[in-house]
Amino acid sequence: MSERCVLHEFSASGNCYKVRLTAALLGIPLERREYDIMKGETRTPEFLKNVNANGRIPVIEIGERFIPESNAACYYIADGSSLIPTERFAHADMLRWMFWEQYNHEPNLATLRFWMRWVGTDNLSEMQRLQLTPKRTAGNSALKLMDDHLSEKE
């Protein structure tokens, strides 16, 4: 990838880490721009207009174009590399795991991590407290499924 790539991020975010890791594995330099999500820096009119109308990070900036969502950013960075399978079934299977991660891992494990690390147990709403056990259960199920799958691989 020869284009200048800017990563708009909250560096403590797991989704932002995925983008940095993908770029690092491929030796692709990233210019990094940090935002404090706890201070609402991704909800400002300027950010919403110029970076991502959805108010979320990570976002990669390529020239004057922006790609939000971590897996879309990872895919863009890795496209054409050894990280993206060229065989059709393997390619679809890779996408399956990327979609699965966002549906099963992120809403459970990543949400719990955010609540525990940045919000704090004492500051959780009653609704969040009620979700702790179900999210832990679903998160553990996701981790077991990944472990079982990986134990069958090299």
Indicate where each model-derived feature is located.
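Cytochrome P450 catalytic-domain "roof"
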Residues: 57, 148-154
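Amphipathic alpha-helical packing segments from all-alpha helical-bundle domains
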Residues: 131-150
